[in-house]
Design a protein with these regions (language model features):
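Juxtamembrane intracellular "pre-TM" segments in multi-pass secondary transporters
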Residues: 2-21, 199-233
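Substrate-agnostic recognition of the 12-TM MFS/MFS-like secondary transporter fold
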Residues: 21-38, 61-75, 81-96, 113-172, ...
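Hydrophobic/aromatic positions within or immediately flanking transmembrane alpha-helices
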Residues: 24, 55-59, 86-87, 115, ...
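A single, central transmembrane helix in multi-pass transporters
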Residues: 24, 28, 36-40, 173-181, ...
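Extracellular/periplasmic helix-loop-helix junction of adjacent transmembrane segments
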Residues: 36, 40-64
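Helix-breaking motifs and short loop linkers at transmembrane-helix boundaries and internal kinks
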Residues: 49, 81, 103-104, 108, ...
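C-terminal transmembrane bundle of multi-pass solute transporters/carriers
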Residues: 68-72, 79, 85, 89-92, ...
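Hydrophobic alpha-helical transmembrane segments
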Residues: 111-118, 122, 147-204, 245, ...
Length: 399
């Protein structure tokens, strides 16, 4: 067998498990709907007052529960049936999507209503996140977990291509309400996939003992590992200040490049790059710090370059490495958090990654929106890239 064929087979190694294929199929279709809603909601919020700050406030409302509950949710997932927790959380998220569609159809949608629903979504997502991702580790052999986690990221980011692209096509003729309704329907697929999983072929992790202090135990585990500690610190900085471009991209597209409806196209380009970042990471049976540092650099440089892109076409092209670096970094951080972690700690590690990735958004989102409205729309994305590059030297000793 050629080396190229070997690399390709190893890239998709964990898909030999039927349970994982079923689960990924449901996640893919459901997440397409999620990105339909995300794209439509961003455009809806910007259309109300033409302010990036409003999107920043919505980001705060949606992700503050992750900051508060995320680490605790990891301990909760380690102590309970992950499949069951994921089922109920996905059901609640589907109900939220139905409510959002109804209030939009009936003309009762407003910024306070959007913020309230986003807050509710945030609570369910904070609990769902470590259980949903931790469930992946129960569907494959232990040696296949890094590959499965990278493919999970590929599935989630691959849906980002179709979601925003569909939104760009459908939002004109259908409007935002129908996109919210389509998202509600999409939850049926992931709920169905959870019901179809063959429980007799699962490899459930040993539940962590009840009691103790799961959040403190998870943080202590990270702090005792110098490489993991530095990776988490850098990841938190990048997530806080360089991953919130969706807050300002609608205004950046409108003000700098004169493309009022260009946001879905930019987001689609980011998503295309994201697939390559996730698949590139899936090649590794073990994540290396050299690869991790490379992705950090790509992400930082891309943010700075996009900020001063001379036209919309160049901006779209630069969104490709932005997606590659960002999603590759997330997939790598997921892999690093799992490859040396005992089974009873895995959900806690995933929860800490989620807190760093999404829980930092309530801080970075409003800051990014404020910079875009008060200092300069270009600086709202460039500052994150600059801060990212300043922290790269922290990773050098682990290369």
């Amino acid at each position: 067998m050629s080396q190229q064929a070997t690399d390709r087979s190893s890239m998709f190694l964990s898909l030999r498990h039927r349970n994982l294929r079923i689960y990924f199929f449901g996640l893919l279709l459901s997440n397409v709907g999620t990105w339909l809603q995300f794209t439509a909601m961003s455009l809806l919020i910007y259309s109300i007052n033409n302010k990036a700050t409003d999107a920043g406030i919505n980001t705060f409302a949606q992700f503050i529960p992750m900051l508060v509950l995320g680490a605790w949710a990891g301990g909760f997932a380690d102590r309970h049936n992950r499949r069951r927790v994921t089922f109920w959380c996905q059901s609640l998220l589907g109900v939220q999507a139905v409510v959002l569609a109804v209030v939009t159809f009936t003309g009762h949608v407003s910024l306070p209503v959007i913020y309230l629903l986003s807050f509710g979504t945030g609570i369910a997502s904070a609990i769902d996140n470590p259980s949903r991702r931790g469930l992946v580790t129960e569907l494959v052999e232990p040696s296949e977990i890094p590959n499965a986690m990278s493919l999970n990221t590929t599935v989630m980011t691959g849906s980002r291509i179709f979601g925003p692209a569909l939104a760009a096509v459908l939002i004109g003729p259908l409007g935002t309400a129908w996109l919210f309704a389509l998202n509600a329907v999409s939850y049926l697929f992931v709920i169905g996939s959870l019901l179809m999983i063959d429980k007799t072929k699962m490899l459930p992790a040993t539940s962590a003992a009840r009691g103790g202090k799961p959040v403190r135990e998870g943080l202590s585990f990270v702090w005792r590992d110098p490489m993991l500690r530095r990776a988490f610190i850098v990841f938190t900085v990048v997530s806080t200040f360089a991953f919130n471009y969706s807050v300002v991209m609608p205004k950046l597209s409108d003000v700098r490049w004169g493309q009022a409806n260009g946001y879905p196209i930019l987001l689609t380009c980011v998503s295309i790059g994201s697939v390559f970042g996730a698949l590139g990471t899936a090649r590794f049976t073990r994540i290396t710090m050299r690869w991790y540092a490379t992705l950090v650099i790509i992400n930082g440089v891309s943010c700075i370059a996009i900020a001063w892109a001379p036209n919309f076409l160049v901006a779209c092209l630069l969104c490709l490495p932005l997606g590659l670096g960002g999603t590759g970094l997330v997939a790598s951080m997921n892999g690093l958090s799992q490859q040396n972690t005992p089974p009873e700690m895995r959900s806690r590690m995933l929860a800490l990654v989620a807190v760093a990735f999404l829980g930092s958004t309530p801080i970075g989102g409003p800051v990014t929106g404020w910079i875009g409205d008060n200092i300069g729309i270009e600086w709202s994305i460039a500052y994150g890239g600059i801060l990212t590059l300043l922290f790269v030297p922290m990773l050098w000793k682990d290369r």
